């Protein structure tokens, strides 16, 4: 593996670990019911993963419930939900047994993306995120999508020795419409339900996200080659299940 890829992977893992430790220091038993509901929905959504055509990575609708959680949950709970969601997406029904560093990178990338999205949205709204839930979801989504896509695209490009621009282009071709639909649904739910009851809207929304998953799964299956060419090196298989 190129030294640049190793350095980048290490940087992301260390950054994600520090954020998890920071969030753990703020733990409190408040809003445990809402926390467990968002945690369960995000974990279930993470199992609905789709392989991105032309890339060695997967995507899932877990981000929808992360965005809704950013309206009602404190920072540490959003980080915890992000961590569990990423672990489920990496480990559940993987095409091949993932390596520890691969799982750690995927988890760190999701934690970083959700943390930056949460902090940006609440900074812009000056702590009034719950008062403007739709705006909070839109702001958070506008950060989560590009950051997460860039982190995943960059590691794939570095590991496989490909230019970043075409890797990002392939990623956005599939991820962008998926995210836009999810953000639209999340914004709709956050606008209909009060911040304290957005979790009810999240429960109602879950079947819709399952149908969205089925649609994109069938669409991506038609775009995937019937047989995958053998990899020329172990490095090209290294991040076969990178999550986005």
Feature locations, PLM:
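Short helix-perturbing small/polar motifs within transmembrane alpha-helices
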Residues: 1-58, 64-170, 174-217
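Membrane-proximal helical linkers
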Residues: 162-167, 219-244
